Amino acid sequence: MKVAAIQTVMGLSPEETVPAAEAAMEAAMQAAEKPDFLILPEYFSYYGLDQKSAVALAQPLAETPAYRMAQAFAKRHKVSVQAGTILAKVEGEARVENVTVVFGREGEVLAEYRKIHLFDIDDLGNGPFRESDYIKPGNDIVTWEFDGVTFGTAICFDGRFPELFRALRLKGAQIITLPAAYTMITGEAHWELFARARAVETQCHLIACGLGGSVVVDGETKSSYGHSVIVDAWGTVLKRAGHGPETLTATLDMAQVEKLRKGIPVIRQRRLVGETVTPAN
């Protein structure tokens, strides 16, 4: 499975960020070995001046520029695209949803996942933050099939909850994706650590696509960590990005996943935790 993580940077307008993301995706498709699957970061289309402005600009999911671009791109290039995350307006709700949507080679929707664990924290150096003030959490654990491979996904803060990743493995996931927008403080300390740990404990390849770059708002600089990584099921970092815009590509060996699971059959050997999801196999 040939994959590409399209690391884009923070922006304050979809009119700026969506075309930039599309240009990076177009460049990735010019490679001699074209990817089968592309992923963008969390908040790739709009980071927002603040929470209120992000909510004010939200539209119904299928009407957003980010959704329309990703769907058209998938159909045009016959490639699967995971459109990072999009803030989507929900009828009758004051809060929006943080949704990642996956398109197949014909632009059909393969999956939609709504972020379950929201980033509500006390002051770690940049002041407190409560994502739940403006985002409605999801509830569903989501997997999908593409080219004979089972994918699962989580979003950013979800990465701190290994039980979600175990549930994805039990639902049959072989590749797990993680669009994210980590802070500089948490990113430097935990981002790659979590990516490798989640890959090892699930015996899945993991594509962690992080938003990078910085914006200045009212004289204050806001930054997102970036440093996307593609990690194999053994926990080896195959590719690693920096802080700016960058595209990572890798060919994921699906036979390695099955070999590891047969060699270290952790799902069969579990004793301390009851089933939350019935194993797929």
Question: What is the meaning of each model-derived region?
Answer:
Residues 257-281:
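A conserved C-terminal secondary-structure "cap"
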Residues 8-12, 51-58, 149-151, 178-183:
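Short, basic, glycine/proline-bearing loop/turn elements
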Residues 1-4:
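Extreme N-terminal starter segment of soluble prokaryotic enzymes
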Residues 61-82, 150, 159-248:
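CN hydrolase (nitrilase-like) catalytic-core segments centered on the catalytic cysteine
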Residues 91-171, 184-193, 197, 259-266:
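Active-site catalytic loop in hydrolytic enzyme cores
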Residues 7-24:
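N-terminal phosphate-binding loop and adjacent alpha-helix
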Residues 7-9, 39-41, 114, 210:
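Residue-level recognition of beta-strand->loop/alpha-helix junctions
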Residues 23-106, 110-112, 182-201:
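Cys-nucleophile CN-hydrolase/nitrilase-fold catalytic domain and related Cys-dependent amidase chemistry
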